[in-house]
């Protein structure tokens, strides 16, 4: 099971992110890995159903509200550029940067997108 965190825009306060849960495994085409690369396009239908397009495949999902939200933490250790207001270094601290309250679940197999198949005459 692959879990990917993406950011969604929100005005003021902490950022609110959405967790995407996919069944199976996603492999990068090249050995560079997936970090920092575009995975696909996320769209919503007029009914609010999430649709993920990855390459020549399409996945339909559903939005699930999490019972207990997740917090996204950033670890700051002494020696980092960020020190507290007095300029003194303290122990390791964690900064909450975002909350995850919802997830998008894609539990069905991806369907291939076929535009048109030419017929041989």
From Swiss-Prot:
Molecular function per GO: DNA binding
GO biological-process terms attached to the record: DNA replication; mitotic sister chromatid cohesion; positive regulation of DNA-directed DNA polymerase activity
Keywords linked to the UniProt accession: Cell cycle, DNA replication, DNA-binding, Nucleus
Cellular localization per UniProt: Nucleus
InterPro entries found in the cross-reference section: Ctf8
A GO cellular-component term linked to this record: nucleoplasm
Subcellular location, principal: nucleus
Source superkingdom: Eukaryota
Family statement drawn from the similarity comment of this UniProt entry: Belongs to the CTF8 family.
Function: Chromosome cohesion factor involved in sister chromatid cohesion and fidelity of chromosome transmission. Component of one of the cell nuclear antigen loader complexes, CTF18-replication factor C (CTF18-RFC), which consists of CTF18, CTF8, DSCC1, RFC2, RFC3, RFC4 and RFC5. The CTF18-RFC complex binds to single-stranded and primed DNAs and has weak ATPase activity that is stimulated the presence of primed DNA, replication protein A (RPA) and proliferating cell nuclear antigen (PCNA). The CTF18-RFC complex catalyzes the ATP-dependent loading of PCNA onto primed and gapped DNA.
Complex and partners: Component of the CTF18-RFC complex, which consists of CTF18, CTF8, DSCC1, RFC2, RFC3, RFC4 and RFC5. The CTF18-RFC complex does not interact with the Rad9/Rad1/Hus1 complex. The CTF18-RFC complex interacts with POLH. CTF18/CTF8/DSCC1 associate with PCNA. CTF8 exists as a dimer with DSCC1.
Name of the featured protein: Chromosome transmission fidelity protein 8 homolog
Organism expressing this protein natively: Homo sapiens
């Amino acid at each position: 099971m692959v879990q990917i965190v993406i950011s969604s825009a929100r005005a003021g306060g902490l950022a609110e992110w959405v967790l995407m849960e996919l069944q199976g495994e996603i492999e990068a085409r090249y050995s560079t890995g997936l970090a920092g690369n575009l995975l696909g396009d996320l769209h919503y239908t007029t009914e609010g159903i999430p649709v993920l397009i990855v390459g020549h495949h399409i996945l339909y999902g559903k939005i699930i509200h999490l019972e207990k939200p997740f917090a996204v933490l950033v670890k700051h250790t002494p020696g980092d550029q960020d020190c507290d207001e007095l300029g003194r270094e303290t122990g390791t601290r964690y900064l909450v940067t975002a909350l995850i309250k919802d997830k998008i679940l894609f539990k069905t197999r991806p369907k291939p997108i076929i535009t048109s198949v030419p017929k041989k005459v």
